[in-house]
Each structure stands twice: as C-alpha cells, then as structure tokens.
Amino acid sequence: MLVALAQMDLAWEDFNTNINRVETFTKEASSKNVELILFPEMCLSGFTNNISSLEKSEDEIIETIKNIAVNNKINIGLGFAIKVDKKGENKYTIISKSGEVLANYTKIHPFTFGGEDKIYSKGDHIDICKINEFKIAPFICYDLRFPEIFQIASKEAHIITVGASWPKAREDHWISLLKARAIENQCYIFGINRIGFC
C-alpha cells in the first residue's frame, strides 16, 4: 500500500484555508496513485484551545472529507477538533475512498501540561480499521508517550498512525518515541506532524 504523509503548515483557526490545502494535497497524492493520505492533528484549525472558534460540526467536517475522498478516489486520515457542549473533542478520522467512515478516534490522552485536558474531553477506546489487507489504528500526539495503548493496538493492527502538532523543542522526543513504539510493538508507525509556527 502506498501511503503519503502530508506535513501541512496550518492556517490558525481558518477552516476554509486549511480544507483547501487538504484538498490540494489529496489531489496531488491521488495523481501519484497513493492509496492512503494522512494529515496531522487538528489540521483544520491548528492546535487551538479556543473551542469557540470551532464552528463546524463533526457531521459537516466528515461530510466534507468524504466528498474529497470520493472525488479523488483515495483513503484519507485526518485530525480535527469539534465543540461538544462546553468542551471540545480532539479527533482523528479515517475515511475510505468510497466515503465510509472506517475509524473515528477521540484522543485518549489530552496534553495535560498544556491544559488540553481542561478544554478537551478524553476518549475512552481504541479504533482499528482495515484498508486492503492492513489493519490500522490511529492515535494523536501526546498518546505517543503512553506505550500501553500502542501495545493493545498492536495485537491487531499492522499500522499505527500518530497525527501530531508536536513542537520543535521536543523533536528528539518525537523521533525517539516513534522509533520506540515501532520497535516495542513490531509494527509500522506513521508519524504525521504539522510544520510552521503555532
């Protein structure tokens, strides 16, 4: 399976600009016969703690991604945030080229040192989906520091993805932890980080 990792420079709290960039990357990947394109954490808003800026509903976002996937005949994995009641949810969804939602994961470990846990609700389960013969489990950023969930996922998954908004100051940790999770669990780990300034 040919996989592309889209390291986007995210436009801060600007859904329209970011979704246009997602579409551009997706079209390019499709033209190169990529079967799965993966985007970073919160790639439609940037890593924001301002949940009032999250105006699109989960249904609206998923419908938009479905259309991009179907129109380009490509599977898409993408991180986004939504407002749910008084808190947010940090999500990673995988949508098939036929428009089916294969996985819709909510981050289990919000980044406590940045106060994410006070603003975003945590998830309570691991999602595993299948594309072709590969089983895939998506995780998000700070989840990478918790090896137990990777061990659980690796009992079934061939591939684990980690969409992130990981800062340059801790780049060594990012690379070391991705390698460690792959070595520990003997599976493929795809890390997709954003670029640019937060």
Question: Predicted segment positions?
Answer:
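Glycine/Thr-rich phosphate-binding loops of Rossmann-like dinucleotide-binding domains
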Residues: 13, 47, 170
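Active-site beta-strand/loop signature of hydrolases that rely on acidic residues for catalysis
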Residues: 3, 18, 26-52, 69, ...
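Alpha-helix N-cap and loop-to-helix initiation/capping positions
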Residues: 13, 17, 21, 53-60, ...
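CN hydrolase (nitrilase-like) catalytic-core segments centered on the catalytic cysteine
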Residues: 59-77, 145-198
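Short, acidic/polar
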Residues: 17-28, 144-151
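Active-site catalytic loop in hydrolytic enzyme cores
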Residues: 84-155, 169-176
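Short beta-strand segments enriched in small/hydrophobic residues
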Residues: 1-9
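Short beta-strand-to-loop element that shapes/binds the nucleotide-sugar donor at the catalytic cleft/hinge
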Residues: 78-83
